[in-house]
Amino acid sequence: MAGLLTLLGPAGRVSTRLRPLAPWLLGTATSCAPPLWALALSHPVPDARLLRTARGDCLSRQEPNRTPEPGGSVTGTEKKLSRTQQLKKVFQEYGAVGVSMHIGISLVSLGIFYTVVSSGIDMSAILLKLGFKESLVQSKMAAGTSTFVVAYAIHKLFAPVRISITLVSVPFVVRYFRSVGLFKPPATKP
């Protein structure tokens, strides 16, 4: 019952929480007060401050524009960025290295798909097995198209994979080149 009361915020709506529902139950050390039922047993008339801490507002007031990240940490006013926004951020942060890496990954991807398509492998069956919609695959594999156009269409279908590879690999490559001494370390902001 107390867990349900803690889960339900004011006015009975389900509230979003950034910490475990019942840290007192798990035995973790927190600065929170015990749940409502424990307050009712210990204090004949709990004051508003005790009720607020029992409701879950003891660590901090949750701002409406704060969002939890998968790792559990919270970004201030920053929302989760889309892949293209993350790619633009990498381009701004790493400059020519990020752009060069992404272009290189794209050219390698296009070359691989061109080789696969020109070798005669039925790519429509492979794409359907990978979970692409049949209408999308058939529109990309129109009859009478050249090998390069089909390879380019498949290359475009795999854009999220290329962007993910770029987002993961660019920081590692830059960090390696900085440790070797090919790149200067980033300038510290005053």
Curated annotation (Swiss-Prot):
Tissue specificity, in the record's words, reads: Expressed in late erythroblast differentiation stages.
Supply the InterPro entries for this chain. FAM210A/B-like, FAM210A/B-like_dom
What keyword terms does UniProt attach to this protein? Differentiation, Erythrocyte maturation, Membrane, Mitochondrion, Mitochondrion outer membrane, Transit peptide, Transmembrane, Transmembrane helix, Tumor suppressor
Topology in the lipid bilayer: Multi-pass membrane protein
Q: Where is this region: Disordered?
A: 56-81
Here the transit peptide covers: 1-58
Compartments where found: Mitochondrion; Mitochondrion outer membrane
The protein's induction, as recorded, is: Up-regulated by the erythroid transcription factor GATA1.
Q: Compositional bias (Basic and acidic residues) at which positions? A: 56-66
Gene Ontology biological process terms in this record: cellular response to estradiol stimulus; erythrocyte differentiation; erythrocyte maturation; inflammatory response; positive regulation of erythrocyte differentiation; reactive oxygen species metabolic process; skin development; spleen development
Q: Which GO terms describe its cellular component?
A: membrane; mitochondrial outer membrane; mitochondrion
Which parts of the sequence belong to the DUF1279 domain? 78-189
Q: Membrane-spanning residues where?
A: 97-117, 148-168
The protein's matches in Pfam families, at most eight in alphabetical order, are given as: FAM210A-B_dom
Predominant location category: mitochondrion
**PANTHER family in the record:** PROTEIN FAM210B, MITOCHONDRIAL
Function according to Swiss-Prot or TrEMBL: Plays a role in erythroid differentiation. Involved in cell proliferation and tumor cell growth suppression. Involved in the metabolic reprogramming of cancer cells in a PDK4-dependent manner.
- Tell me the protein family, please: Belongs to the FAM210 family.
Protein name from the UniProt record: Protein FAM210B, mitochondrial
Species of origin? Mus musculus (Mouse)
**Higher taxonomy:** Eukaryota, Metazoa, Chordata, Craniata, Vertebrata
